[in-house]
């Protein structure tokens, strides 16, 4: 079953194929073919790559580990209020919009949080920034704008 939330992945999927988000949300899940072993491996490799890049670039970071949206959002908001430098696997929420950027990076500047604000960063296995990546990051930026008042 598809999430009841509008997510950054929905925007990514839309740019891949405009019909994809519709079928994800309203299509019969029994008609969906299971992932192949190669597809499962590619997903696992992508996560391993992401974790390696985040560790290499940022070293230490605070991680939001829970998958529950409300718990993950509460943890993320608490870390943002504390002003931690890097949040890995953050969860942003506003109404029925939910985003899970790979990283939130703290920057100096005024926001509702204090003398800092956060920007979204996503790790991709690509040599160039694609429009679907920009759509995801823009979605996360809109959520951050709502949360940070800027």
Regions found by a protein language model. Name each.
Residues 82-150:
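Mg2+/Mn2+-dependent nuclease catalytic core
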């Amino acid at each position: 079953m598809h999430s009841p939330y509008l997510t950054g992945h929905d925007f990514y999927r839309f740019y891949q194929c405009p019909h994809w988000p519709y079928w994800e949300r309203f299509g019969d899940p029994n008609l969906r073919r299971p992932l192949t072993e190669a597809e499962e491996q590619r997903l696992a490799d992508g996560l391993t790559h992401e974790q390696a890049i985040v560790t290499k670039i940022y070293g230490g970071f605070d991680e939001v580990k829970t998958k529950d949206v409300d718990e993950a959002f509460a943890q993320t908001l608490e870390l943002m209020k504390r002003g931690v430098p890097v949040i890995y696997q953050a969860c942003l929420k506003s109404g029925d919009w939910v985003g899970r950027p790979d990283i939130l990076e703290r920057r100096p500047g005024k926001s509702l949080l204090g003398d800092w604000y956060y920007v979204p960063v996503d790790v991709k296995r690509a040599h160039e920034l694609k429009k679907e990546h920009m759509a995801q990051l823009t979605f996360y930026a809109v959520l951050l704008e709502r949360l940070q008042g800027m």
